[in-house]
A protein has these predicted regions:
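PDZ/PDZ-like domain segments forming the peptide/carboxylate-binding groove
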Residues: 103-142, 146-149, 192-229, 233-236
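Small-residue-rich helix-interface/hinge motifs
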Residues: 1-67, 365-386, 390
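Hydrophobic alpha-helical transmembrane segments in multi-pass membrane proteins
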Residues: 2, 92, 96, 100, ...
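Functional transmembrane alpha-helices
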Residues: 68-79, 192-218, 226-228, 233-364, ...
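Internal alpha-helical transmembrane segments
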Residues: 15, 50-122, 174, 377, ...
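Pore domain of cation channels
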Residues: 83-96, 353-367
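PDZ/PDZ-like peptide-tail recognition elements
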Residues: 86-118, 155-159, 164-171, 175-211, ...
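Low-complexity, proline/glycine-enriched hydrophobic segments characteristic of transmembrane helices
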Residues: 119-142, 154-157, 169-173, 178, ...
């Protein structure tokens, strides 16, 4: 995604006649590459991003190395420099829009419930959902200020809710009820998430992953299996399955594998206070595909708005102290782990979806008015324009100090997320996180 970002800067600069001296994948010493014209295309030693170097940037002017030629970056009119600065984020945002748009045009398997209105199939006894008055068969017609919410919207809103009441409008066999629901807080990987113990109507539990050495693997459960009954009772939900597993006794499962129906027996494994069977569930899926470009573009737009909304809520909770920045922000190691996890759960489709999410976040982040980032360049251009109205200009000393502040901030942020990633790896090595245990139930 960083390469796409830098390519945006590069190609727009080339189109506008600005000399590009270096296009680098990575930072630090040059490992290898090639030269075409005035540009050195290189791979560098530290694979944590990349950069584009234009002729006649700030430091060259300060060091007296600028020749003042017409193809230097700072010799360009403000509108050209603005287009070059904004091109990187725009390329990222466009990429983020194109990924889900292309995906739905090609077609992919998606949870069948994501786009459906919330109709409750199971409410866990004793849960906050039951205490609020929700029952099996209820249809949620309003969730906060959202009318006819889908399961996707419901899930996203609940997971970022940290103990606040949510007003609900419920249709129960034609009777309209006004209820309030407060999600319970569950800690996963030492980070809080909102949880509501209810589910859509299920006809089976799909198997997305099977953990090595688990009861599921020992019993012969495989990825793609569909569990239709447990101890002779039809599957009605994941919480029903968990309740039976927590009894700690051998279970008998009816499993659909392709055209076959199998009977599988297994005994849950005890870990701490819990009994685990050792697989990750998958909801029923359907082929999501359209031949309409307009529909596909709308899907791409909605997908990105959803990501922005969730990201905004998480950052708001970080700044308000409700959520830990140390647990919420990931660096290169964390992103690599998320990529592997996305592939394990959804294959290359999951990886591509994650790349779109990262591309969007990278594009939006770079528009923030922080020195060194593209938003900082745009801010400087705005200041230049305002000063120009009264006959003043920015001094090179101010530019240098502005860039130095930004450079320090970016280094501190990079160090922070890399240390976080390393700390999480060490914690997992010595102490298995609750999130993983929850996943295996």
């Amino acid at each position: 995604m960083v390469v796409i970002h830098e390519f945006g800067h590069f190609i727009v600069a080339k189109m506008l006649g600005i000399a590009v001296e270096t296009f680098s994948v990575g930072f630090g010493p040059r490992l290898f590459g090639f030269r075409i014209g005035d540009t050195d295309y290189r791979f560098s030693a530290i694979p944590l991003g990349g950069y584009v170097k234009f002729r006649g940037e700030n430091m060259e002017l300060l060091q007296g190395k600028s020749e003042g030629s017409v193809d230097e970056f700072l010799s360009q009119p403000k509108w050209k420099r603005f287009l070059v600065a904004v091109a990187g984020p725009v390329f990222n945002i466009v990429t983020a829009l194109l990924i889900p748009t292309a995906a739905i045009l090609v077609g992919f398997q998606a949870d069948i419930y994501d786009s459906q209105q919330v109709v409750i199939g199971e409410v866990t006894p004793g849960s906050t959902a039951e205490q609020s008055g929700l029952q099996k068969g209820d249809r949620i017609t309003a969730f906060g200020d959202r009318q006819n919410p889908t399961w996707s919207y419901w899930r996203d809103s609940v997971i970022t809710n940290l103990g606040e009441d949510i007003p609900l409008t419920v249709d129960r066999n034609g009777q309209i009820l006004q209820l309030k629901l407060r999600p319970r807080i569950e800690t996963r990987g030492k980070e809080p998430f909102g949880v509501v113990d209810l589910e859509p109507p299920l006809s089976y539990i799909g198997v997305a992953q099977v953990q090595k050495g688990s009861a599921a693997e020992n019993a012969g459960l495989k990825v793609g299996d569909k569990i239709t009954t447990i101890n002779g009772a039809p599957v009605t939900g994941w919480h029903q399955f968990r309740r039976v597993i927590q009894e700690g006794r051998e279970v008998t499962l009816s499993v659909q594998r392709g055209q076959e129906t199998l009977t599988i027996k297994g005994e849950p494994q005890k870990q701490g206070d819990d009994y685990l069977f050792g697989f990750t569930r998958r909801f029923e899926t359907k082929l999501l595909k359209t031949d309409s470009l307009a529909t596909a573009l709308r899907y791409g737009w909605d997908s990105n708005i959803r990501v922005l909304r969730l990201t905004g809520e998480v950052f708001q909770q970080i700044f308000s102290g409700q959520r830990s920045a140390r647990r919420s922000l990931a660096g290169p190691i964390g992103i690599a782990e998320q990529t592997v996890s996305a592939y394990d759960i959804a294959g290359w489709a999951g990886v591509i979806e994650l790349m779109g999410l990262l591309s969007l976040n990278l594009g939006v982040l770079n528009l923030l008015p922080i020195p060194v980032l593209d938003g900082g360049v745009i801010l400087l251009l705005l200041i230049e324009w305002i000063l120009g109205l009264v006959g003043l200009t920015l001094t090179m000393n101010f530019r240098e100090r502005f860039q130095q502040v930004g450079f320090v901030l970016v280094l501190l942020l990079m160090g922070f997320v890399i240390i976080n990633d390393s700390a999480r790896l060490v914690e997992r090595f010595f102490d298995k996180p609750p999130a993983q245990e929850q996943q295996k139930k």
